[in-house]
Amino acid sequence: MQLSTLTALSPLDGRYQDKVTPLRAIFSEFGLMKFRVAVEVRWLQKLASTADITEVPPFSTQANAFLDGIVANFNEADAARIKEIERTTNHDVKAVEYFLKEKIQNEVELVKVSEFIHFACTSEDINNLSHALMLSTARDEVILPEWQKLIDEITRLAEEYKTIPLLSRTHGQPASPSTVGKEMANVVYRLKRQFKQLQNAEILGKINGAVGNYNAHLSAYPNIDWHKFSEEFVTSLGIQWNPYTTQIEPHDYITEFFDAVVRFNTIIIDFDRDLWGYIALNHFKQRTIAGEIGSSTMPHKVNPIDFENSEGNLGLANAVMTHLGQKLPISRWQRDLTDSTVLRNLGVGLGYCLIAYASTRKGISKLEVNQPHLLEELNQNWEVLAEPIQTVMRRYGIEKPYEKLKELTRGKRVTEQAMREFIDKLDIPQEEKLRLQKLTPATYIGAAVELVEKLS
């Protein structure tokens, strides 16, 4: 059976492959090879730029350009060659080293120093930096831009619907009114916090040998400050340096990275469920799309499938990333290999994220507030004005204001007339009575509009 979108085992590479395309060049095996090649080449160039390593003299402009070209022009044929070499070596990182030696075999200047490719490195020196570059690239080029799109869409809802009143529900029961826009603004604020946390998350790397002590480095060049050398190299890649490790970078930062994504996703799940509920309550209508079918047997159905799809995929994403976050920081003694197979799934959780984010945005694009229904619902719940009335009563020293409103309203459907009559009987200044008489459930929205306007 030929591999295709129809025969792929994972829906990421099958049904949903077009939605995860931006991640394939980063987290596929091709992507991992590309970053490994880049790290190996930059390490060789770093060695050549160090005067104390006389065996690797400074490279000429032509030699550096050739090496830069290997990195910049890395393609699928190169990746296929690495896989071919690996069939002999049975070692993926060693295959990259041999591939690079092949690439430079006709470059006299570089052939002379070919044994300094992968010099003093353990495989994990190359791998951890490659993984760091993968996560950094995905964050900056894919995930944060996707997050910004979602934030922008929900911000648009907040601004568009900032004045449309909404009957709130706490514990599922009618509560003090808000506005549709303010409820969207709450979500935006939460998402922006997580955006900043991922944006500022540290991405760490190390290059310090088989157990983190520069043993091999010092055996060959005991007079070089390898601690400083390591820091310079790691930071030159745009990665923060971790000076204290075993054979592996301990992956704590990966847990922190995925925890931030999981928190963002959890907020979106909350948003998806709220929108699903608002649609069920008829607060929102969904624009229909010609040709779409909601049910195989019930022709009338327009289901909130986009929010459901998002919720489901975010659940998968969070499950994968939570496992990575819990497993990766644990490695026996100076290292075991349990992290290796898990790290090959770095992009899986993020792939499910992309599917979900696209679904949430699609669901948002179909939304249309059902304002007449919202106003009708508010008009049926005059009891929500018990809160402002009893609060004003407290101000003017009326005895047991809460209890009096409780007796009038608790568990009851109160009419406008009943509330007006109650206000008329209050022993409070006339201007306060008039102010309370003007209140309706639709106008009792506090500072909701102003809070939306302050969001930006």
From Swiss-Prot:
User: According to its UniProt record, which residues of this chain constitute the active site?
Assistant: H171 (proton donor/acceptor), S295 (proton donor/acceptor)
Q: Which EC numbers characterise this protein's activity in its record?
A: 4.3.2.2
> Which residues does the record give as N(6)-(1,2-dicarboxyethyl)-AMP binding sites?
15-16, 90-92, 122-123, 247, 296, 301-303, 309, 335, 340-344
Catalysed reaction(s)? N(6)-(1,2-dicarboxyethyl)-AMP = fumarate + AMP; (2S)-2-[5-amino-1-(5-phospho-beta-D-ribosyl)imidazole-4-carboxamido]succinate = 5-amino-1-(5-phospho-beta-D-ribosyl)imidazole-4-carboxamide + fumarate
Q: What class of enzyme is it?
A: lyase
Q: In which pathway does it act?
A: Purine metabolism; AMP biosynthesis via de novo pathway; AMP from IMP: step 2/2; Purine metabolism; IMP biosynthesis via de novo pathway; 5-amino-1-(5-phospho-D-ribosyl)imidazole-4-carboxamide from 5-amino-1-(5-phospho-D-ribosyl)imidazole-4-carboxylate: step 2/2
Protein's GO biological process: 'de novo' AMP biosynthetic process; 'de novo' IMP biosynthetic process
- Coiled coil ranges (UniProt) are none
The cellular component terms of Gene Ontology attached to this UniProt record, alphabetical and capped at eight, are: cytosol
Q: Which family does it belong to?
A: Belongs to the lyase 1 family. Adenylosuccinate lyase subfamily.
Its assembly, as annotated, is: Homotetramer. Residues from neighboring subunits contribute catalytic and substrate-binding residues to each active site.
What task does this protein carry out?
Catalyzes two reactions in de novo purine nucleotide biosynthesis. Catalyzes the breakdown of 5-aminoimidazole- (N-succinylocarboxamide) ribotide (SAICAR or 2-[5-amino-1-(5-phospho-beta-D-ribosyl)imidazole-4-carboxamido]succinate) to 5-aminoimidazole-4-carboxamide ribotide (AICAR or 5-amino-1-(5-phospho-beta-D-ribosyl)imidazole-4-carboxamide) and fumarate, and of adenylosuccinate (ADS or N(6)-(1,2-dicarboxyethyl)-AMP) to adenosine monophosphate (AMP) and fumarate.
Q: Know the name of this protein?
A: Adenylosuccinate lyase
What gene is this protein translated from?
Answer: purB
